[in-house]
Amino acid sequence: MISNFINKIWIINYKNIEDKEFIFDNKINCLVGNNGVGKTNILDSIFHLCIGKSYFNLRNDQIINKKNDFMLIEGDFVCNDKNEKIVCSIKRGGKKVLKRNNKAYKKLSDHLGLIPVVLISPYDTDLINDGSLERRKFIDSIISQNNKTYLNQLIDYNKIIQNRNKL
């Protein structure tokens, strides 16, 4: 049986988390704590390593701790029975760097699908209440993780739509 799981994550200056390391069991893990201590930010940082971007924040400067000029997330995963180290770093005002086993990706889309993940939050009521656009985006994100052809065609399609809308 092929299994994917996270062994460990080290988070530095990610939102309200200044410097923490978390070690996980390969079965079930529970995050427990008072409101505002960073439980959701831990989940978002894991999502960030799996997808290459935050689930909750579109802009990189929103995820860097306000007291610092950079953020770093480092995760040790087991993917398809192989050890994988994923690192994401951002300097304030700079570009995001995403690395797999110490090698930087040229395109973020090359990373998508290595560590499939789905995150659903209380903010996702729009999947049910709003129109089909939000549902389509959600389904596209899931399919794209498992089908590179679909991902590449979706990227091309979105570029065509953007170009058309500029006319």
Model-derived regions: residue spans:
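An accessory alpha-helical subdomain
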Residues: 126-167
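Pre-Walker A-like glycine/lysine-rich segment at the N-terminus of P-loop NTPase domains
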Residues: 1-48
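Nucleotide-state sensing region of NTPase/ATPase domains
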Residues: 51-126, 132-134, 146, 150
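Short, histidine-centered active-site or binding-site loop motifs used for metal coordination
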Residues: 28, 121, 142-143
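ABC transporter nucleotide-binding domains
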Residues: 27, 45-46, 114-116, 138
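Regular, well-ordered alpha-helical segments
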Residues: 48-51, 166
